[in-house]
Amino acid sequence: FDENIFLYLENDDLCKRIIDNDENIYIVPRSKIKHLGAKAVDEKYEYEIELSRNWHWVWSKFYYNKKHYGLINAYIKVCPIFISATLKMLLYFFINKRKKEIYLFRMLGFLNAAIGRKSFYRPKINY
């Protein structure tokens, strides 16, 4: 696994590298996996997890595309998400604080990836 990827696209990255090395990926059609999504974390942290998801989704998307297809392709693929997040953040600025912050975190994930910062953001959870 690429240790730079904290969350999102780690499976895509692994499969891409396997294919690029002319190795095989096996599919088990009858296999089933139930993904519970953040069930290991107390529900009181749900919003913090949502912020983290949005930050890492955009960061990982930019990083993955830059790594495998180059910087220009990363901008082409991820700039529309950044522009959309910016517009939505402005739309929700005065009417919905939570949605405003979610789109702000998408923007921050993009900006940090674009300037080459590592995937540093972690949810603020106290056990």
What do the PLM-derived regions correspond to, one by one?
Residues 99-127:
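Membrane-interface aromatic/basic loop that binds lipid-linked glycans or pyrophosphate carriers
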Residues 4-16, 53:
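Acidic donor-binding loop at a coil-to-helix junction in glycosyltransferase catalytic cores
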Residues 16, 20, 24-97, 101:
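Active-site-adjacent helix/loop segment of glycosyltransferases
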Residues 5, 29, 55, 115-118:
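Generic secretory/membrane-interface signal
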Residues 6, 13, 69, 74, ...:
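Short linear sequence elements within intrinsically disordered, low-complexity coil regions
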Residues 11, 22-23, 31, 105-106, ...:
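Generic hydrophobic/packing signal
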